[in-house]
């Protein structure tokens, strides 16, 4: 035990050991941090001076400017190359058309020489390749210009036309395609074959918009015929080609040169004039036929209208209708259902019954028939068939719900006097006196501007007969304003059932409560005997409405006893 105590370290020694351990840990941590920061630039290496930063920016800008200039120069070079290639394409197309002109001139002027050349060359039927025109090993010879017959002006190409290379150039006349050694033409040249007319097939060659907008556009000129000197002897022309002619149309190239075989130009002009005259004649025929059809339709409509008018007039003279509807009945009453089924207005066309009476003015009806179309054919304003006033004999069975109006008394006696006679409308009365007093709100949407409808609505002349007694008619409601408030509970109950009892609605069950205090006081004041009477009355009404309910019948019998 004593040895262990002697071996124990003092407090200071232990502190020093702890300090050493802490230093070692610090060194280890610093070494690890240094290894990690070796990838990152040290703070001493970071540039903090503004002058050096500006220099770096300037250097970067210079490099960017140089790169831009280099790219621009490359773009300019590419554009120059494109322009040069386009020029070469233009020159090649000019050479093509010059060769075509030479061929057409040889075919028209020297057919005998062409036949001799064909006989000296290979047979046309020996090989399929013999159909192509070959120009082989042509020396570089400038093109000669010869004037066409009948032309005063000549076209000269500004730049030098490059001569044809020594490679072979072939033109297939049967297919209408131009071929080189690679069998490919530039994209700006397109070839298509046209129809044969007057035993001469015309080949039209079209170039793209680049050639149209070039220095050739905007000038009216024609190529001059170009001829080669010696190498034409080696050319082999088949018999199928001798009747071909090449034309460069003005529609394809704006004011561009065209090569036309003499003799065909006048024929094409005559054809164009003939086609134009035929078109004008056909248009005139079409217009005449349309006018005739319209006149026929109008005559048919008039005849139909007149026939209908005559039939209706004859029916009016024979019999007087027995069933007529009065317009004033329930015109503004939304909840009167006595005559609802009879007065059913629809916005569609109504089929008039055979016994309907039509009083019409002759002159106005004829003018309306002429102006408007018939039925489905016309698009005129739709005039609905009018409802007429009811006879008092047919309306005698209907219960009278309102007292008689003063205005209705004027027309009652006339129905009795004219019941056996056919009614006729006055033709000399002005439209102001002919307006119907029974015009209601429901007919406002269907009112037309024609006076004929007004004449129809007044089917009875306003004559008075003092001796005749007054017949009860339903009162016309004269309210000009419309009430849009919510209907009361009584009107709601009357809406569906016309047999409800008005006294039953006086019960306190159906009275609306305005204030809670008043309702409480009234409920307290009501005696139990009165409540029992009201309940019995309610049960009776329920049984009358629903007679199939047996329980209610038993309860009513018990309560009544």
UniProtKB/Swiss-Prot annotation:
Compositional bias per record (Polar residues), positions renumbered to this chain = 388-398
Q: Which GO terms describe its cellular component?
A: centrosome; chromosome, centromeric region; condensed chromosome, centromeric region; cytosol; kinetochore; nuclear speck; nucleoplasm; spindle pole
Q: Where is this motif: D-box 1?
A: 192-200
Output compositional bias ranges, type Low complexity. Answer: 364-375, 422-433
Q: What is the recorded phenotype of mutating residue 61 to I? A: Loss of interaction with PPP2CA and PPP2R1A and loss of centromeric localization
Q: Which residues form a coiled coil?
A: 7-89, 273-313
Q: What InterPro entries does UniProt report for this protein, alphabetically?
A: Shugoshin1/2 (IPR038889), Shugoshin_C (IPR011515), Shugoshin_N (IPR011516)
Per the annotation, the residue ranges of the short sequence motif PXVXL/I motif are 451-455
Q: What is the effect of changing residue 146 to A?
A: Loss of proper localization to spindle pole and mitotic spindle. Significant increase in split spindle poles
Which molecular-function annotations from GO does this UniProt entry contain?
A: kinase binding
State the span of motif (D-box 2).
438-446
Indicate where the modification Phosphoserine is found in the sequence: 14, 256, 436, 507
Give the GO terms filed under biological process for this record. attachment of spindle microtubules to kinetochore; cell division; centriole-centriole cohesion; chromosome segregation; meiotic chromosome segregation; mitotic sister chromatid cohesion, centromeric
Disease / disorder = Chronic atrial and intestinal dysrhythmia: A disease characterized by dysregulation of the cardiac sinus node resulting in sick sinus syndrome, in association with chronic intestinal pseudo-obstruction, a disorder of gastrointestinal motility in which intestinal obstruction occurs in the absence of a mechanical obstacle.
> How is the subunit organization of this protein annotated in UniProt?
Interacts with PPP2CA (or PPP2CB), PPP2R1B, PPP2R5A, PPP2R5B, PPP2R5C, PPP2R5D, PPP2R5E, SET, LRRC59, RBM10 (or RBM5), RPL10A, RPL28, RPL7, RPL7A and RPLP1. Interaction with protein phosphatase 2A occurs most probably through direct binding to the regulatory B56 subunits: PPP2R1B, PPP2R5A, PPP2R5B, PPP2R5C, PPP2R5D, PPP2R5E. Interacts with PPP2R1A and NEK2. Isoform 3 interacts with PLK1. Interacts with CDCA8.
Q: What is this protein called?
A: Shugoshin 1
Originating species: Homo sapiens
Q: What is the lineage of its organism?
A: Eukaryota, Metazoa, Chordata, Craniata, Vertebrata
């Amino acid at each position: 035990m004593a040895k262990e105590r002697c071996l124990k370290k003092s407090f200071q020694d232990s502190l020093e050991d702890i300090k050493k351990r802490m230093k070692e840990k610090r060194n280890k941590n610093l070494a690890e941090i240094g290894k990690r920061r070796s990838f990152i630039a040290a703070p001493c290496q970071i540039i903090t001076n503004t002058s050096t930063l500006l220099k770096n920016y300037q250097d970067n800008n210079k490099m960017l400017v140089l790169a831009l200039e280099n790219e621009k120069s490359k773009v300019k070079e590419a554009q120059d190359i494109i322009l040069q290639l386009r020029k070469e394409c233009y020159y090649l197309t000019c050479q093509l058309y010059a060769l075509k002109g030479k061929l057409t001139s040889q075919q028209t002027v020297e057919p005998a020489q062409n036949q001799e050349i064909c006989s000296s060359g290979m047979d046309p039927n020996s090989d399929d390749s013999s159909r192509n025109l070959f120009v082989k090993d042509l020396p570089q010879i400038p093109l000669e210009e010869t004037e066409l017959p009948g032309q005063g002006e000549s076209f000269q190409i500004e730049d030098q036309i490059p001569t044809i290379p020594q490679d072979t150039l072939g033109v297939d006349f049967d297919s209408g395609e131009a071929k080189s050694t690679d069998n490919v033409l530039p994209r700006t040249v397109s070839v298509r074959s046209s129809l044969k007319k007057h035993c001469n097939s015309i080949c039209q060659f079209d170039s793209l918009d680049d050639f149209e907008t070039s220095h050739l556009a905007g000038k009216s000129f024609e190529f001059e015929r170009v001829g080669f000197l010696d190498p034409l002897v080696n050319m082999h022309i088949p018999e199928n080609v001798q009747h071909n002619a090449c034309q460069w149309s003005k529609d394809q190239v704006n004011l561009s040169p065209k090569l036309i075989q003499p003799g065909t130009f006048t024929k094409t002009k005559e054809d164009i004039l003939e086609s134009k005259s035929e078109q004008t004649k056909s248009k005139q025929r079409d217009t005449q036929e349309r006018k005739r059809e319209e006149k026929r339709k109008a005559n048919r409509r008039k005849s139909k209208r007149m026939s209908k008018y005559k039939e209706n007039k004859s029916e009016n003279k024979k019999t007087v209708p027995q069933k007529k509807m009065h317009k004033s009945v329930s015109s503004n009453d939304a909840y009167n259902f006595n005559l609802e089924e009879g007065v059913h207005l629809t916005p569609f066309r109504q089929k008039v019954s055979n016994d309907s009476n039509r009083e019409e003015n002759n002159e106005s009806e004829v003018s309306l028939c002429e102006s408007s179309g018939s039925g489905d054919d016309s698009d005129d304003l739709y005039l609905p068939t009018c409802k007429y006033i009811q006879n008092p004999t047919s309306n005698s069975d209907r219960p009278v719900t309102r007292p008689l109006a003063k205005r209705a008394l004027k027309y009652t006696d006339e129905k009795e006097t004219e019941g056996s006679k056919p009614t006729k409308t006055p033709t000399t009365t002005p439209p102001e006196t002919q307006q119907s007093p029974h015009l209601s709100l429901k007919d406002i949407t269907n009112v037309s501007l024609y006076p004929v409808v007004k004449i129809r609505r007044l089917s009875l002349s306003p004559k008075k007969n003092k001796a005749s007694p007054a017949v009860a008619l339903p009162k016309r409601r004269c309210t000009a304003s419309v009430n849009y408030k919510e209907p009361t509970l009584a009107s709601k109950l009357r809406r569906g059932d016309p047999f409800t009892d008005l006294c039953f609605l006086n019960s306190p069950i159906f009275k609306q409560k305005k204030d809670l205090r008043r309702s409480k006081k009234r409920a307290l004041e009501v005696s139990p005997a009165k409540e029992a009477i009201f309940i019995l009355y309610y049960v009776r009404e329920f049984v009358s409405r629903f007679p199939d309910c047996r329980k209610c019948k038993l309860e009513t019998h018990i309560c009544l006893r």
